[in-house]
Every structure is written in C-alpha cells, then in structure tokens.
A protein has these predicted regions:
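Short Lys/Arg-rich basic patches
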Residues: 1-32, 42, 83-89, 96-99
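Residue-level signal for the start and early helices of compact helical domains
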Residues: 10-12, 21, 25, 40, ...
Length: 99
C-alpha cells in the first residue's frame, strides 16, 4: 500500500514494516470518467492504480477517509477536467450505455 501524502498516515505501521501479500490480476469494468480521474491521481502521486485502489478500499473498510484535504481538492479539479459529475449517491444506480 502507498505510504505517502495521498493516503492519511493513520496506520500504526511505518514504511519499514511492510506487510507481505499475494496479489492477483483482475479485470474490472469501471465508469470511463472515473477511471480518467483515478489515472490522473496515480500519475500525480507516482503510484500504481492497484496501490490506489487498495488504499481506498482498506480505508473504507475501517470507515476512514483515504485522502488528505489537499488531495480531495486535486480530485475535484480532475473531476471538473474530465466532466465527472457522479456522486456517492449514484453508487449502485448506474446503467451502462448500449453501444
């Protein structure tokens, strides 16, 4: 998991206490503009998309916010840039466009 300014340093572990895990390759479908925002974050923070997603999920599982106030501001800018208007209330209410 990423241990920089993107993710709050709320974990008791430090950078020197890395946890060994087994990762698997997976394919997921995700909303196009959301992926653009996520890719912009990983590019800016110099991390992988997998690291970002793991950090978001681990924080969510503990009811914690995964982003610093500064990163949240940056995310808002990326959302505007890529026209992402989806909100949390839209979760589980998305319908895929027919091609």
């Amino acid at each position: 998991m990423y241990h920089g300014t993107l993710v709050h340093m709320t974990q008791e572990k430090t950078e020197h206490q890395l946890v060994e895990v087994e990762r698997v390759q997976t394919g997921v479908r995700i909303e196009k503009r959301m992926l653009k925002v996520l890719k912009a974050i990983v590019e800016q923070k110099d991390i992988t998309l997998g690291d970002l997603l793991e950090g978001i999920v681990l924080h969510a599982f503990e009811g914690k916010t995964p982003f610093s106030p500064q990163t949240l501001k940056e995310i808002e800018q990326f959302k505007q840039l890529y026209g992402m208007t989806l909100k949390a209330a839209d979760s589980h209410h998305l319908k895929e466009r027919k091609r």
